Swiss-Prot record:
Its cofactor is NAD(+). It holds the Pfam family Epimerase. GO terms for molecular function: isomerase activity; nucleotide binding. This is UDP-N-acetyl-alpha-D-glucosaminouronate 4-epimerase. NAD(+) binds at F26, I27, D46, T50, G51, D77, I78, Q97, Y165, K169, V195.
Length: 348
């Protein structure tokens, strides 16, 4: 039995009270679903700026009515300290996912990104400290590595940030570290590497590449690749991220606390490889033989050419073991979008 399997069993036997910020978002709704499956009580905070009611509705269809009754939703904003205080009351564990999470968005509107990602983060840290929560796990980002050339990326080696978004996520780490040293506060940062999976928004100017390409191919629309397609990423399926959050929040090992960890698979896939995995995967699911080819555009400002994580640290300290590689994660993701796209995204 893995450490994560043992933890899931333990949580069912001794339920806790959790707060998820950004609960109506892609990752937040995934965490909500898993915690409700485990019969936990979950408080969710969201202002629907980038999250969606239909994500919460979809979670509701996947859990029992009894499990759903353990979910308490607060429509609020992390930029308002009183909302953060209300959400943190009587909470054991905080999973802070709320943020404006787009490099292009941050280049277009750095002030809004700073407000949500730094001011909002500090509000949540302070409210959680004052509420004496057991732990505060927050979404950090692989963008923190910036222009550092080394591959794979190791937590202790970072470069200069390449976007306002990257600046905000690094500032999160600095604040968490100061709170840990100044207030004996338990915070763990998770540097996510290109997370994908069910409920990830395929629409809009700032959509991630995997859901956008899936929806476009389902609608027989052209696929655009920024650059020549050799750009590569360490794509990480949502279930791996959920595992990392729960292991981080509940660890009792002092040596593992107040650290930052990469959350990824530890491998990389080029955009060209990704395109054909998605196209051919959809062909299998739909019993079709599409041979559509991508259209190449200019490289996108603020992006790094290659990204791959070293996951030795999180495996060592938290016993994290990614259960889904890119192929298995895509298999699950494609099935979800094929089943759901006509009802959730048909109007776009």
């Amino acid at each position: 039995m893995t450490a994560y399997e043992e933890l899931r069993t333990k949580l069912v036997l001794a339920p806790k009270r959790w707060l998820i910020t950004g609960v109506a978002g892609f990752i937040g709704s995934g965490l909500l679903e898993e915690l409700l499956f485990l019969n936990q009580t979950v408080i969710g905070l969201d202002n629907f700026s980038t999250g969606y009611q239909h994500n919460l509705d979809d979670v509701r269809t996947s859990v029992s009515e009894e499990q759903w009754s353990r979910f308490i939703f607060i429509q609020g904003d992390i930029r308002k300290f009183t909302d953060c205080q209300k959400a943190c009351k009587n909470v054991d564990y905080v999973l802070h996912q709320a943020a404006l999470g787009s490099v292009p968005r941050s280049l277009k509107d750095p002030i809004a990104t700073n407000s949500a990602n730094i001011d909002g983060f500090l509000n949540m840290l302070t409210a959680a400290r004052d509420a004496h929560v057991s732990s505060f796990t927050y979404a950090a980002s692989s963008s923190t590595y910036g222009d550092h050339p080394d591959l794979p990326k190791i937590e202790e080696r970072i470069g200069r940030p390449l976007s306002p978004y990257a600046v905000t996520k690094y500032v999160n780490e600095l604040y968490a570290d100061v709170f840990a040293r100044s207030y004996e506060f338990n915070a763990i940062g998770l540097r996510y590497f290109n997370v994908f999976g069910r409920r990830q928004n395929p629409n809009g100017a700032y959509s991630a590449v995997i859901p956008r390409w899936i929806l476009s191919l389902l609608k027989d629309e052209p696929i655009y690749i920024n650059g020549d397609g050799s750009t590569s990423r360490d794509f990480c399926y949502i279930e791996n991220v959920i595992q990392a959050n729960l292991l981080s929040a509940t660890t009792n090992d002092l040596a593992s606390k107040n650290k930052v960890y990469n959350v990824a698979v530890g491998d990389r896939t080029s955009l060209n490889e990704l395109y054909y995995l998605i196209r051919d995967g959809l062909n299998l699911w739909r019993n079709e033989q599409s041979r559509a080819e991508p259209i190449y555009k200019d490289f996108r400002d603020g992006d790094v050419k290659h990204s791959q994580a070293d996951i030795t640290k999180i495996k060592t300290f938290l016993s994290y073991e990614p259960e889904f590689d890119i192929k298995e994660g895509l298999k699950q993701t494609l099935k979800w979008y094929i089943d759901k796209h006509s009802t959730l995204y048909s109007s776009v």
